[in-house]
Amino acid sequence: GVSLAITDNRQLATTQGLAMSGKLEGAVHIMSNPSLKVLAGLQAVSEIGADVQGVALKVYLNNVLENLVGFKGLTGDLAGSVEISGNAALTDLDGFQSVTAATAATITNNANLITLHGLENVKTFDGEDPKGNSLTIRTNAALVDANALQELAVVSGGIDIDGNTNLQNVAGLIKGLTSATKVSIHNVICFSTSDETAFSLLATGDVNVEKVTSVTACEGNGK
């Protein structure tokens, strides 16, 4: 079920009045709040459950939401997946530093998300979304790198990265990764043959990647 749903509040600018703590049995949904700038009152929540779709935390279409530090109390292994989508003002994922695992992560259509900072301690995605993916990063136009994922080792399902037009490389993702099923990676500015080889060695399913043939694309990217 869902323990907290903040949805379709056109005027709500802050959740300062919330005072929740400890463990929430269900999921948290923060969706379609066009004026919400500040998430507060959740810092003492350490654990959340999941909804019937297996989603633990969904932050969707909050156009002016400045950050996710309101979730900094979350620790350990989340009971479901995390979906961060359509939040135009977010620049990073600061707030998840104490999270070490989730079933899956979907990070899509966050126009000003420059970095995945906040996911540095995530080591495992041990489930799949309905498409069979454990990690989906799509259409984040400002995203530059995946360096925050250097500790990520185990991905139980697929990896889908596409449409992040400023993504320089996925070196950070490759660094610690030991397993995944299918891998689909496109539109990365520097994606080399050695990157393809690395994914081919660890993936148990199809590897569908777009290599960059331009030498200049990888200059200055440590290739």
What is the predicted function of each stretch?
Residues 197-200, 222-223:
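Extracellular/mature segments of secreted proteins
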Residues 1-11, 17-36, 41-65, 70-90, ...:
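Concave beta-strand-loop units of leucine-rich repeat
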